[in-house]
């Protein structure tokens, strides 16, 4: 559910965002001021990513508590997925 909300809000934000260095800040201001509920979509996207990572960390904590790390292959796939999610978040946050 978190990932679906992130994808949808990200798509709506991408419809109005320009990555040009001269107009990027203006496009964010446009999203917040001129787009209907743009401020809400931007806040949902920002806070949704934090909530998504909290859910991931709780999931990891549950796995540690119940000893799921003993299943090496499953645990390694989870670690790889965690690293991919963190890399994707970094690329989406830093590079635009």
From Swiss-Prot:
<comment type="similarity">
    <text>Belongs to the cytochrome b family.</text>
</comment>
<keyword id="KW-0479">Metal-binding</keyword>
<dbReference type="InterPro" id="IPR005797">
    <property type="entry name" value="Cyt_b/b6_N"/>
</dbReference>
<dbReference type="GO" id="GO:0008121">
    <property type="term" value="F:ubiquinol-cytochrome-c reductase activity"/>
</dbReference>
<feature type="transmembrane region" description="Helical">
    <location>
        <begin position="75"/>
        <end position="95"/>
    </location>
</feature>
<keyword id="KW-0813">Transport</keyword>
<dbReference type="Pfam" id="PF00033">
    <property type="entry name" value="Cytochrome_B"/>
</dbReference>
<feature type="binding site" description="axial binding residue">
    <location>
        <position position="45"/>
    </location>
    <ligand>
        <name>heme b b562</name>
    </ligand>
</feature>
<dbReference type="GO" id="GO:0046872">
    <property type="term" value="F:metal ion binding"/>
</dbReference>
<feature type="transmembrane region" description="Helical">
    <location>
        <begin position="1"/>
        <end position="15"/>
    </location>
</feature>
<protein>
    <recommendedName>
        <fullName>Cytochrome b</fullName>
    </recommendedName>
</protein>
<keyword id="KW-0999">Mitochondrion inner membrane</keyword>
<keyword id="KW-0679">Respiratory chain</keyword>
<keyword id="KW-1133">Transmembrane helix</keyword>
<keyword id="KW-0812">Transmembrane</keyword>
<dbReference type="GO" id="GO:0006122">
    <property type="term" value="P:mitochondrial electron transport, ubiquinol to cytochrome c"/>
</dbReference>
<keyword id="KW-0349">Heme</keyword>
<comment type="subunit">
    <text>The cytochrome bc1 complex contains 3 respiratory subunits (MT-CYB, CYC1 and UQCRFS1), 2 core proteins (UQCRC1 and UQCRC2) and probably 6 low-molecular weight proteins.</text>
</comment>
<feature type="transmembrane region" description="Helical">
    <location>
        <begin position="39"/>
        <end position="60"/>
    </location>
</feature>
<keyword id="KW-0830">Ubiquinone</keyword>
<dbReference type="GO" id="GO:0005743">
    <property type="term" value="C:mitochondrial inner membrane"/>
</dbReference>
<keyword id="KW-0408">Iron</keyword>
<comment type="function">
    <text>Component of the ubiquinol-cytochrome c reductase complex (complex III or cytochrome b-c1 complex) that is part of the mitochondrial respiratory chain. The b-c1 complex mediates electron transfer from ubiquinol to cytochrome c. Contributes to the generation of a proton gradient across the mitochondrial membrane that is then used for ATP synthesis.</text>
</comment>
<keyword id="KW-0472">Membrane</keyword>
<keyword id="KW-0496">Mitochondrion</keyword>
<keyword id="KW-0249">Electron transport</keyword>
<dbReference type="InterPro" id="IPR016174">
    <property type="entry name" value="Di-haem_cyt_TM"/>
</dbReference>
<dbReference type="InterPro" id="IPR027387">
    <property type="entry name" value="Cytb/b6-like_sf"/>
</dbReference>
<feature type="binding site" description="axial binding residue">
    <location>
        <position position="59"/>
    </location>
    <ligand>
        <name>heme b b566</name>
    </ligand>
</feature>
